[in-house]
Amino acid sequence: MKFFLLLFTIGFCWAQYSPNTQQGRTSIVHLFEWRWVDIALECERYLAPKGFGGVQVSPPNENVAIYNPFRPWWERYQPVSYKLCTRSGNEDEFRNMVTRCNNVGVRIYVDAVINHMCGNAVSAGTSSTCGSYFNPGSRDFPAVPYSGWDFNDGKCKTGSGDIENYNDATQVRDCRLTGLLDLALEKDYVRSKIAEYMNHLIDIGVAGFRLDASKHMWPGDIKAILDKLHNLNSNWFPAGSKPFIYQEVIDLGGEPIKSSDYFGNGRVTEFKYGAKLGTVIRKWNGEKMSYLKNWGEGWGFVPSDRALVFVDNHDNQRGHGAGGASILTFWDARLYKMAVGFMLAHPYGFTRVMSSYRWPRQFQNGNDVNDWVGPPNNNGVIKEVTINPDTTCGNDWVCEHRWRQIRNMVIFRNVVDGQPFTNWYDNGSNQVAFGRGNRGFIVFNNDDWSFSLTLQTGLPAGTYCDVISGDKINGNCTGIKIYVSDDGKAHFSISNSAEDPFIAIHAESKL
């Protein structure tokens, strides 16, 4: 009996690393700045049937409404209260979305902004998404309520009160991140208010949280908050399920704060992943795809079972956050599809796909002066995500998750889940291939010359549909067909000028 009890407790201890997705669903998508009503529809009409595991939603709590510049995306990272009331929708719409998505097996993960409230320079008043009064100057947030006692002003030792030196781990945690009022997370009252907010979301039915700015919180303070959280709603989750936790920690090396400091609380965002993969696919600094043979921990990344991975995120696709110029985004569509394809085929980490909106980029001295621009809107009201006849999105919503090449690789990852990384091939340059056991195989040509070779796929004999160039529809293939012989070998030809210079086949794409 002791043995069973031990297993029982271990199961609960490890729960925050598990994404709580339905069996066979292995990726989530960040529907950045989408309205709750559009997410609910997308769960039903697209995400569920296409095998997506869940959605990371933008912060659902009340934030400052900023008009200079006009309604920037980053206003949502400046909380005013924990009321569920934003440009994405109100609490009723949020509840409706969570219910409808869970009912079709698609989970909701909340971007939780709990390190801070709004900036200290914001004017007092009711310029907030729900009309709540707040006064940053006097540290007064009556809608929570928080007062001057609940902030770290007294603990911060820098002259400005802001973080001035990232080599000082204490000020990174106890001072203000770019002027944002830093909550005193060691106080039980503050921890309780945050846990109350997160428990409200858990009770509604969310499956987990991205913890924004985790690097700026002490790991022990995060743990104290997590220890107060409810189990997930048993309408949709097994009894005793814990919320999935992934912490935003930017650790590119060279600073005292390490991702590993946070492993006790949950997974961490591995920012090295997209930065390095972008450098490789762009072939910068002499990097080659052949070097990806030991991708993952071999590149100095966090352990696979602690990693939340992505090619780009809402910050670094516009030059914020971490990764710099190497980050690939939808603006670099051809290379981007290859990078996302590689990520979704490779077993390392838990994968998140980005879904963006277009904005008018304007570079001056190498910087995008429009990096602040918020989502498509009419006078500040977020525009509907319209769906075009060809299944792409309108109204300047990019919907990368609907691109055939990306959607089909989300399915590929589901099909090969649990299979080993096998049958690696490289030409010493930028032509590489690998398999996932006997369930899938993928080939890339990122060289400036064509690729034509017979490779061992590890797959059963038969005719397969390449899910990059087309789809398997009613037993037919709209793209390239690949013939695997009895010995598991197949011939692949990929021109370096192909629209998408990669091919992927899997057990479910067999004709």
Curated annotation (Swiss-Prot):
InterPro entries attached to this UniProt entry: A-amylase/branching_C, A-amylase_C, Alpha_amylase, Glyco_hydro_13_cat_dom, Glyco_hydro_b, Glycoside_hydrolase_SF
Annotated positions of the Pyrrolidone carboxylic acid modification? Q16
The positions annotated for binding chloride are R210, N313, R352
UniProt superkingdom: Eukaryota
Q: Which residues form the signal peptide?
A: 1-15
List, from the UniProt record, the residues annotated as the active site of this protein: D212, E248
Q: Which GO terms describe its cellular component?
A: extracellular exosome; extracellular region; extracellular space
Q: What class of enzyme is it?
A: hydrolase
Question: Where are the annotated glycans?
Answer: N476
Give the UniProt tissue specificity note. Detected in pancreas (at protein level).
Reaction catalysed by this enzyme = Endohydrolysis of (1->4)-alpha-D-glucosidic linkages in polysaccharides containing three or more (1->4)-alpha-linked D-glucose units
The record's section on CDD domains has: AmyAc_bac_euk_AmyA
Q: Please state which protein family the record places this protein in.
A: Belongs to the glycosyl hydrolase 13 family.
The protein depicted here goes by the name Pancreatic alpha-amylase
Q: What is the lineage of its organism?
A: Eukaryota, Metazoa, Chordata, Craniata, Vertebrata
